[in-house]
Amino acid sequence: MTNDYGLVSIITPTWACAGFIAETIRSIQAQTYTNWELLVQDDCSTDNTKEVVELFAQSDNRIKYECNDRNSGAAITRNNALKRAQGRWIAFLDSDD
């Protein structure tokens, strides 16, 4: 598939999804369209979600992790990631989908 359609910013809000987030990231990496950035916005997880995401980010610079200053809920978490988005297109993908 051609990548001429522009950058897609995939926003993934997360909270305590260490058990699911790796599969979510792998599903994005497996897409045929490769012009994307993944913005994982953590709502102050208490598990090792951060470590899982950062492990992927070490080998794929399209993956970016950020954590809220405090637990804020899904809407604020999505909006925080949206502020960082660089893409022409925005897609939302929950971390447990």
PLM ranges: what are they?
Residues Y5-V8, Q29-V40, N48, D60-K64:
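Short loop->beta transition adjacent to catalytic acidic/histidine clusters or analogous donor-positioning motifs
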Residues M1-A30:
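N-proximal low-complexity "stem/linker" segments adjacent to membrane-targeting elements
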Residues G19-A22, D47-L55:
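Acidic helix N-cap motif at the loop->helix transition within catalytic regions
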Residues S27, T34, D42-E51, R70-S72, ...:
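A conserved acidic beta->alpha catalytic loop
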Residues N68-A85:
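Glycine-rich, basic loop-to-helix element that forms the pyrophosphate-binding segment
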Residues I90:
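Short aromatic/hydrophobic "clamp" motif used to bind/position activated sugar donors
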